[in-house]
Amino acid sequence: MTRSVWKGPFVDGYLLKKADAALSSGRKDVIKTWSRRSTIMPQFVGLTFGVHNGHKHVPVLVSEDMVGMKFGEFAPTRNFPGHAADKKAKRK
């Protein structure tokens, strides 16, 4: 079930403040965030966010195609190492 239109997109307040400060100062520093649930807004385009994946901050450069998506979609939380190789096939 999607979010109601009348509510509008969810963005943590501190994230908006940090993005506005970065845009006004012109600095290109990475903005660290733990808010994976926040929606990417149009004013975030061109900024780099460090989205926490539970282990470290993954750098995410926001482009126009990402607007409307959540930050968590771009920082995977699980690492798939691959399936175990067949030991019998390796010996031959």
From Swiss-Prot:
GO terms for molecular function: rRNA binding; structural constituent of ribosome. It comes from the Bacteria. Keywords: Ribonucleoprotein, Ribosomal protein, RNA-binding, rRNA-binding. GO terms for biological process: ribosomal small subunit assembly; translation. PROSITE patterns: RIBOSOMAL_S19. One of its GO terms (cellular component) is small ribosomal subunit. Pfam families: Ribosomal_S19 (PF00203). Protein S19 forms a complex with S13 that binds strongly to the 16S ribosomal RNA. Belongs to the universal ribosomal protein uS19 family. This is Small ribosomal subunit protein uS19. It comes from Caulobacter vibrioides (strain NA1000 / CB15N). The lineage of its organism: Bacteria, Pseudomonadati, Pseudomonadota, Alphaproteobacteria, Caulobacterales.
